[in-house]
Amino acid sequence: MSDQKMNQYEKLKKQLKDNINKKKTHDKNLNSLEEQIFTLEGAYLEETSHGNLVKGFDTYIKGAQSKKRYVFNEDDRLFSLSSAVFLKHQAKTGAGGDLDETKNERKKTASQKRRKGDSTPMSGDEKPSKRSRVD
C-alpha cells in the first residue's frame, strides 16, 4: 500500500510541477499582451488627440485647429488601468514607468512651455487663463 501511495504522490508532484510551469507560461503571455495593449493604447490616444473614444469627438466635429496638439492624461488609459495584474506588474518591475511619475513629467513640460510664452494647452483638462478685460 505504501508503494501505491508513493506512486500517487509522485504522480501528483509531477502534475503540480507541470501546472506551475503552465501558469508561468500563461503569466508571461498575459503580461506580454497587457504591455502590447498599453503601447497600442498610448499610440491611439496620442494619434487621435483631436477626437477619440475616451474624450469624445467634440473637437473633431467642431473642426478645431489641427495645430493644437493635446497630450493625453494617463487617467485616459481605460484598458491598461482596468487590469490590476498589469498595474501590480508595473509597480513591481518599474516597466513602462510609474504612472504618477509620468503625470508629473507631463505637468512639468506643460508648465515650462507656458512659461516660455506658448499659450497652447497641453492636455484636454488644462485651459489657458482668461485675461481680464481692462476698460
Curated annotation (Swiss-Prot):
InterPro entries the UniProt entry points to: Eaf6
Keywords: Chromatin regulator, Coiled coil, DNA damage, DNA repair, Nucleus, Transcription, Transcription regulation
Basic and acidic residues bias: start-end ranges: 124-135
Protein name in the entry: Chromatin modification-related protein EAF6
Gene: EAF6
Listed GO biological process terms: chromatin organization; DNA repair
Entry function: Component of the NuA4 histone acetyltransferase complex which is involved in transcriptional activation of selected genes principally by acetylation of nucleosomal histone H4 and H2A. The NuA4 complex is also involved in DNA repair.
Subcellular location: Nucleus
Annotated segments matching region Disordered: 92-135
Family: Belongs to the EAF6 family.
The protein's assembly and partners: Component of the NuA4 histone acetyltransferase complex.
GO annotations of cellular component type: NuA4 histone acetyltransferase complex; nucleus
Recorded coiled-coil stretches: 1-42
Primary localization: nucleus
